[in-house]
Amino acid sequence: MAIQPGEARATGAGVEPVASPDVVWLRLETLSPRARRELDRIVAAAVALADREGLEALSMRRLATELETGTTTLYRYVTGRDELLELMVDAVNGSDGQVTGRPTAWRDGLTLVAREARARFLAHPWLASQLVARPTIGPNTLLGAEFVIAIALELVDDPDTAASVTSSLMAYVQGSVAAELAEREAQRRTGLDEHAWRETVAPWVRSILADARFPAFARVVLAADDLSFEERFAFGLERLLDGFATLEAHGPRGAATRKRTS
C-alpha cells in the first residue's frame, strides 16, 4: 500500500516520518541557501506591502510587480497567497524581537508578552486578523508560544488552565488593539482626528447630557479622565492579571473540573 503524506515508513534505523509536501515548514528545510534567501526577500516585500496598504492590496500579481519579477517566479517558492501569509506571520514574529527565553516571574512575564504582542499588532495592522483561525506553527511563532506557555505553567501547573490563560491573554490584546486600529482607520477615512470628531458631535452630546434618561452616561462623560489607548490597555491588562492571580489561591480550573466529575 502506498504511504500517504504524514505517515511513517520503516528504515534501517527505525521509523522515519514521511514529510507532507503541503507543510511549508518541512519544505523549507530542503531549500538551498540561495533559494532560502530569495524566499526571505519575497516574504519581506510582502510584509512591507501589507504594512503599507493592507492585506487587500496583497496578491501574487501585485507582489511580483513590487519585486519586478514574474508571477510564475513567485510560485517556485510558495504555493499561493495563503502559504505566503503563513510565512509573513512567522517572519514578523521573528524579526520584531518576539520574547523568547526562560520565563521570569509569571506576572512580569505575561505583562511583557502582552506589551510585545500589542506593539507587534500595531506595527503590522494586518497581523491580528491572521491569528484568529488556525495558528501559525512556524519556528519563530512556536518559540514565542513556548515562552508564554512556560510562564502560564509557572502560574498554575495544569495544562488545561495554562492553555486558557494564554488564549485569554492574547484575546485581550487582540481586542484592545482592534479598537485602536479602528480609530486609526476612522481617522484615515474621515480625515478627522479624535478631537475634531468630538467637536463635530458636540451639539448632540450636549443634548444627551441634558437628558434625564442618561445620568450615568453624563457622569462619566463629565467627570472621568480621558484615558489614552495605552492607559486603557494597561488598566485592562492589570485587571486580567489580577484575575489570573486568583488561580494561585483557588487552584487550576482544569484540575477542579476533573475532581468534580471523577
Walk through the language-model features, giving the residues of each.
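N-terminal intrinsically disordered/low-complexity leader segments
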Residues: 1-36, 211-222, 252-262
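Short, amphipathic alpha-helix enriched in basic
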Residues: 34-59, 90
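Alpha-helical structural segments
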Residues: 41-48, 83-98, 109-116, 143-150
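HTH DNA-binding helix-turn interface
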Residues: 52-55, 68, 75-85
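Append "Primarily bacterial transcriptional regulators
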Residues: 62-65, 74
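Amphipathic alpha-helical segments used for helix-helix packing
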Residues: 89, 118-143, 147-149, 178-188, ...
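Hydrophobic alpha-helical connector segments
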Residues: 98-143, 159-162, 166-169
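Hydrophobic alpha-helical bundle segments that form small-molecule/ligand-binding pockets
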Residues: 144-200, 225, 244-247
